[in-house]
């Protein structure tokens, strides 16, 4: 089964009413001790005078920082609704066919600075926390999550091809190693104009969302990086290169 890794969006969509988070109902419950340590520390930081500086946000996001304080009681929403923005708009979970949604629920994993890893059906409250954050008493979040995620995700991957649509900030928290790396494919997006290639961040997020949607809608399960390249190549110009322990699939868009 193909596994697709996504980053969270910065913005989150919440609800005014609803049940609060039930930690035991979340995927990867073995991550709960780390989740609670991170979120309780986040709540303390968010209630302090240093909140904006530690979290790297401005006063205009004060309402989002305030929600961090009440993470245990805020209404929880499915990850499929929680995350928004360019990548998730392109993915378009709400408009997937029933079969594609079932595949999304089992194949999509969001790597999160607050929750470690989530599936689409996991219900959590909105939060404001980047994986690039260093929390007092815990340290850099990518380091905090590295060992717990390795234990959980290494087991979850099995023999799957791993399609990595994360940014480098979130990839730092977990990178497949050893034999798992042989099926780890990071998706890169470049724009080619007049023979010159460049990376456009907004465009790259959009295309990664489209790639994830295409994989879900295809109903196919490429068993190797080369089979993945062939499948993506039906829709885009795609180049596959071995990069270190894993692979990079470069999607080339032409102007």
Where do the PLM segments sit?
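Generic hydrophobic, helix-prone segments enriched in Leu/Val/Ile
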Residues: 37-42, 64-65, 228, 232
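Generic signal for short, ordered secondary-structure residues
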Residues: 17, 67-70, 90, 190, ...
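Internal, well-folded beta-alpha domain core
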Residues: 93-255
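Generic preference for well-ordered secondary structure
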Residues: 22, 26, 67, 71-75, ...
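A broad, low-specificity signal marking well-ordered, structured residues that form hydrophobic/aromatic
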Residues: 4, 86, 185
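A glycine-rich, hydrophobic loop/mini-helix early in the fold
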Residues: 51-126
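N-terminal "assembly arms/tails" that initiate or stabilize quaternary assembly
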Residues: 1-61
